[in-house]
Structures are given as C-alpha cells and as structure tokens.
Amino acid sequence: MASSSNVNGNLVDELEEAFQSCIHALTKEESATGVDKDEIKLEVDQTTLKFIDLARQMEAFFLQKRFLLSALKPDLLLKEENFDLKQEIARKDELIRKHYEKIESWKNLLSDQQNYNKPIQSLPPDMRGNLTGGVPGGPGMMPGGIGMPMQNSMQVQQMQAQQQQMQMLQAQQMQQQMQSMPIG
C-alpha cells in the first residue's frame, strides 16, 4: 500500500496536470488546430470537471489530516484558536483606536468652528477698545493719521474676511475627512 505522502504527492501532481490541461483547453484556438467550437467546449468541460474533482479529493485529504490532528493533539487546535482570537482582538483594538482618533479630530474641528463663529463681543477687551475708538493718542485719530471710523471698519472687514477664509478652510477639511472615512 502506498504511503500517505506518496498519495498526496500523486494527488498534487494530478491536480497540477489537470490545471494545466484546463488552461491549455481554454487558450486553444480553433483556427490553429482545425477543431470546431463544440469540440473545444466539450474538452473545456471535461478538463474543468476533472480539475474540480481532483480539487475536491485534495480538500478531502486535508480535512482527513486535520481531523486526525484534532483527535490526536487537541491542544494544537486550542493554540490555533487562541492565536486567531488574539489576532482578531488586536485588529479590533486597532480599528477602535482609529475611530477614537477620528472622533478626536472631529471634536477639534467642531470646537474650532465654534470658536470662529463667536461674535466680536467675545474678543478680548483690548481689541474691543480698538474697534470702538478707545485708542490713546487723540480722539478719532490714529498715530498714522487715519481717522478712527475708517480704521475700525477696515479692522472689522479684515476680521470678517479672515473668519470667512477659516470657515471655508474648515469646510474643505471636513469634506476631505468625510470622503476619506470608510463607509459602514
């Protein structure tokens, strides 16, 4: 009687030959061989069925070996399951960590957005004083000679433009993050 490794070796060789003949039948051209389409189709079907049959035999062989191994050494199966569970836990921990990072970045974006949307009254008192004309050096005149109402309106316009730019930048960042987030 042949040993199991010899049978397995023969089975592997037969599977490889069946695969090669299947590929050969699929790539054969009818004009070059003088064989019509029906004969080629029949050959493809036969070689494919043989390949599938040998693949099932190979699968059955490995299942038998796995069953023998589980019966003779159950501790190996437990070690394998333990290893698989550890890998699964590590993968899920990494996924959770990535979600927490995204949540933190979203929190930061939202808090930044809320800070930029605060009205001018929330500015520090020294900046509010500049906007209302409370600058030392003369009523209504800046040291550079620009009138206070004009200077105030320029500062307000600059601040509004900066706020709009920041809001647009944040909106773009949020869109990019939403596009990079996996669905599901």
Curated annotation (Swiss-Prot):
Q: Where in the cell is it found?
A: Nucleus
- Disulphide bridges, residue numbers: none
Gene Ontology terms: cellular component: mediator complex
Q: Which domain of life is it from?
A: Eukaryota
Keywords, in A-Z order:
Activator, Coiled coil, Nucleus, Transcription, Transcription regulation
Pfam families named in the record? Med28 (PF11594)
Where does this protein have coiled-coil stretches?
A: 77-105
Query: What function is annotated for this protein?
Result: Component of the Mediator complex, a coactivator involved in the regulated transcription of nearly all RNA polymerase II-dependent genes. Mediator functions as a bridge to convey information from gene-specific regulatory proteins to the basal RNA polymerase II transcription machinery. Mediator is recruited to promoters by direct interactions with regulatory proteins and serves as a scaffold for the assembly of a functional preinitiation complex with RNA polymerase II and the general transcription factors.
Could you say which protein family the record assigns here?
Belongs to the Mediator complex subunit 28 family.
Q: How the protein assembles, per its UniProt entry?
A: Component of the Mediator complex.
Its name, as the record gives it, is Mediator of RNA polymerase II transcription subunit 28
The species is Aedes aegypti
